[in-house]
Amino acid sequence: MTLSPYLQEVAKRRTFAIISHPDAGKTTITEKVLLFGQAIQTAGTVKGRGSNQHAKSDWMEMEKQRGISITTSVMQFPYHDCLVNLLDTPGHEDFSEDTYRTLTAVDCCLMVIDAAKGVEDRTRKLMEVTRLRDTPILTFMNKLDRDIRDPMELLDEVENELKIGCAPITWPIGCGKLFKGVYHLYKDETYLYQSGKGHTIQEVRIVKGLNNPDLDAAVGEDLAQQLRDELELVKGASNEFDKELFLAGEITPVFFGTALGNFGVDHMLDGLVEWAPAPMPRQTDTRTVEASEDKFTGFVFKIQANMDPKHRDRVAFMRVVSGKYEKGMKLRQVRTAKDVVISDALTFMAGDRSHVEEAYPGDILGLHNHGTIQIGDTFTQGEMMKFTGIPNFAPELFRRIRLKDPLKQKQLLKGLVQLSEEGAVQVFRPISNNDLIVGAVGVLQFDVVVSRLKSEYSVEAVYESVNVATARWVECADAKKFEEFKRKNESQLALDGGDNLAYIATSMVNLRLAQERYPDVQFHQTREH
């Protein structure tokens, strides 16, 4: 049976994001993936922070200065017979809620681990978010051109700390200065590494067969024998790759290589297009939507202002769940129940915009937006339903924001509300005073907000410390009890950017006491958009 042209397009799509701890090599691997996808001609390494050729996926001013990827951008490229959508996630010391939310828009994740360090803190946090939806995970052990930890130890650590089985697909031969290449367990082939070829796609020499004398000649008898001994162990002690278990998020195929040396990335990409799922079904508040349905549906997972400094616009990123987008089509924005004609949607190669004529499930569209679209908005061809699972996360850090020029209060509030709709930061307005409190998941979000208020809204602001430890969204089914709670706790209540009521706690103890005192009131750590 041949698939219809529409279903062929759906089956070709692979949508994934990269998760890693800062400096594990995520931006470098993004570059190399784009190089293999022929989206860029030569990989400009990120280390050249002084040069003008910044990594293709890092773009706002501040990112350019710091050499870090603050904004989630989207890149589409062809690979083999597939079309791959890569969603870049902020990966530096200070990520934000955007990173979490981007993981709600993908069908698969690539976990990049620095093989000299193993599993690190940020990787653990991001894996927890992928667990909310049992997202399939591929793993790339990076930096084999440096001295690394014992590969078996690395696999054990991933299994024990992240609670996911490891199925090695390739296995390293040596590391650091002695790194010779990798052996593919399922193809019985050895790929030999040449250093100094990181900027281009290299012709790799392949030796067929583990017992081929050419292998001993190529890597040396000692390393060849060590490889054979290690593989005996590996085959006995590790999981075999099983596609069903991978799709259920229970095992992860593991690849070894060096992104900087541009080696091993293609093996991982081959695995990604072969095994990662085509666009998956999605839950709404009324039913499950299948990618094969012909009516268009999609949801907004991120909003970004000022993607083009020359235009003061904001772009909403929408993941297509079902149906085909065609230029000029009319869509229903479910939250407002209004119909809108979408004629100028964008697709992205980071920083380069191009208008798109059509898009399919798994693709990401950019919608021009002048403040009318919010995170979590669902678009359909008329059906009134809302996609679920795109939450706000309770901030962990808080600052009071103060104007240098008190006459600009109106612009400040406008800027903060827009930035909060976009997910750059959360803003809380205490009921009992005129303060403005800004909440974030990571410190860098505060810097981003001040620099964007200045460049986009001409508002100069500074931060002051504030006695807030955490926030929880509150609601209560019993209106009378809720009124009593609000009356007695007025000094600790605030409205967020969307006018939802939140309890602002001065300490975790204070929060616990409030929860005990008011058992009928629900204190939520996340809030559905």
Curated annotation (Swiss-Prot):
The protein's role, per its UniProt record: Increases the formation of ribosomal termination complexes and stimulates activities of RF-1 and RF-2. It binds guanine nucleotides and has strong preference for UGA stop codons. It may interact directly with the ribosome. The stimulation of RF-1 and RF-2 is significantly reduced by GTP and GDP, but not by GMP.
Keyword set, alphabetical order: Cytoplasm, GTP-binding, Nucleotide-binding, Protein biosynthesis
NCBIfam families per UniProt: prfC, PRK00741.1, small_GTP
CDD domains reported for this sequence: RF3, RF3_II, RF3_III
GO biological process entries: regulation of translational termination
GO cellular component, one term: cytosol
Family matches, as InterPro entries: EF-G-like_DII, EFG_III/V, G_TR_CS, P-loop_NTPase, PrfC, RF3_C, RF3_dom_3_sf, RF3_GTP-bd
The tr-type G domain, residue ranges: 11-280
Chain's gene name: prfC
Residues at which GTP binds: 20-27, 88-92, 142-145
Domain of life: Bacteria
Localization of this protein: Cytoplasm
Listed PANTHER family: PEPTIDE CHAIN RELEASE FACTOR RF3
Transmembrane residue ranges: none
Protein name as it appears in the record: Peptide chain release factor 3
Pfam family, one: EF-G_D2
Keyword hit for Protein biosynthesis: yes
GO MF assignments: GTP binding; GTPase activity; guanosine tetraphosphate binding; translation release factor activity, codon nonspecific; translation release factor activity, codon specific
Predominant place of localization: cytoplasm
UniProt family annotation: Belongs to the TRAFAC class translation factor GTPase superfamily. Classic translation factor GTPase family. PrfC subfamily.
